[in-house]
Amino acid sequence: MVVTAAYGTDQVRQAGGQRAMLPVIAGAGADGVEIRRELFSHDELLTLPALSETIELLGLLACYSAPAALFMPDGTLNPDLPRYLSEASTLNALWLKVSLGHFNDKQPLEALRALLNASGMALVVENDQTDCGQLAPMQRFKAACRVMALPVTLTFDMGNWLWVGDSPEEAARHLAPAVSYIHVKAAVAHNAQFRAVPPDHADARWLDLLNQLPADAPRGIEFPLEGADLMAVTRHYVNLLREE
């Protein structure tokens, strides 16, 4: 999977939106694309059926990412979740991805089960760069889903653990069985924080980490894709991740 945001907001906008990036992604030999809700204008959100048609014509799979938390600060389910699930269905996405948010207890999970059953859409929850994306709450959520046999799996963002002060390797040890999608990126120290870089621009830690995660989980390229020939750059990393 190639995450459209890997090309940068400005590049996507200048190209004419996410739809304009699809031939690059397909031409690079990728299996699919992660469409990002935050990169849509209001008008573009109204053209999801046409975007879905283009994705299908190019032979790509799709997943859909909404920049939203599953749980609100008071612990309730995000009231916009049905809208995001519906948009994902319109795209014929394989799954909807959100961040965890403020997960406190199992009480809202039956309502979540009902929503997912009604929509027929798979849901994956990602560790983000907030306190809610730390290992401890992600573990609690994983355990609650297991106890309740809730069909929700995890997106493992390889780099985000560093932003929240956790060990990516420890996170992999605890969460790997529940991981169904991997956001691949390396991270290096930058101005007292971190920045995402391609895995072949960093040390072997990141490819070692990838080997701790399920081999059959789709891999999403979320590190910066830059250069004069974006198709060639994308193809390089699609091939790199297929080989690992």
Language-model segments: residues:
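Histidine-acidic metal/acid-base catalytic patches
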Residues: 1-6, 10-29, 89-92, 135-156, ...
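N-terminal pre-domain/capping segments
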Residues: 1-82, 89
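Active-site-proximal loop/turn and secondary-structure-junction residues that shape catalytic pockets
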Residues: 6-8, 37-39, 68-70, 100-104, ...
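Conserved beta-strand positions in the central sheet of alpha/beta enzyme cores
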Residues: 34, 63-64, 97, 124, ...
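A structural signal for alpha-helical segments
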Residues: 43-46, 104, 170
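Short secondary-structure transition/capping segments
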Residues: 45-48, 75-77, 108-111, 136-138, ...
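Short, electropositive alpha-helical surface patch
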Residues: 51-62, 115-122, 215-216, 231-244
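Active-site acidic/histidine proton-transfer and metal-coordination neighborhood
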Residues: 54-62, 70-153
